[in-house]
Amino acid sequence: MKIAERIPKPDFMEEAEWDLLMKTRAPEIIRLGARAHVQTYRESNGEGDTYLTQGAPTLLLTTIGRISGTEQTMPANFLQDGDDVYVVGSIAGLDRHPHWALNLDTKPKAWIQIKADHYEVDVKRLVGDDRAAVWPVLTEFFPLWGHFQKYCDREFMVFKLNRKAS
């Protein structure tokens, strides 16, 4: 897999923060970091250092593996707007979609944990005009999504999640 090495530092980040992000964006490092993040998030119910990643809130997203058929849990940055929760499959601008996004696209069944609140969600992938309408809001909230998208050949998948009616 090719990793875009020459993504310039955005103006909104400090040099040291950007350097660390660039050093840790290899898939193997992301995978190991995600496992540790899931464990500490669950233990703390998302309190303390586990809630914010790169300055944006983090949830735990559990999907059904499109190949394995088993539950897979990953941390993901999100934007909550009322009852709507948005997640973006950016994976730091790597040249492939994150597994969780491919899982949601193939099997739109998921659960999320935001701090101590766990619930099943309805999943809708936003494409075309629906994606275009929300993209400026998402990138204003978390500028890294927009910055990485500028330097990535693939279009990041965007999903809207809503609490499943009981």
Listing of model-derived features with the role each one plays in the protein:
Residues 54-55, 149-153:
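Short coil/turn segments at secondary-structure boundaries
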Residues 48-49, 145-149:
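Short helix-to-loop capping/linker segments positioned immediately adjacent to catalytic or ligand/cofactor-binding
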Residues 81-83, 117, 166:
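Short strand-connecting beta-turns/loops that link adjacent beta-strands
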Residues 23-66:
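Short, conserved active-site entrance elements at the starts or edges of catalytic domains
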Residues 59, 157-159:
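Short beta-strand micro-motifs in enzyme catalytic cores
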Residues 55-92:
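Short beta-strand segments
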Residues 2, 8-21, 91-144, 151-154, ...:
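Short, structured beta-strand-loop surface elements
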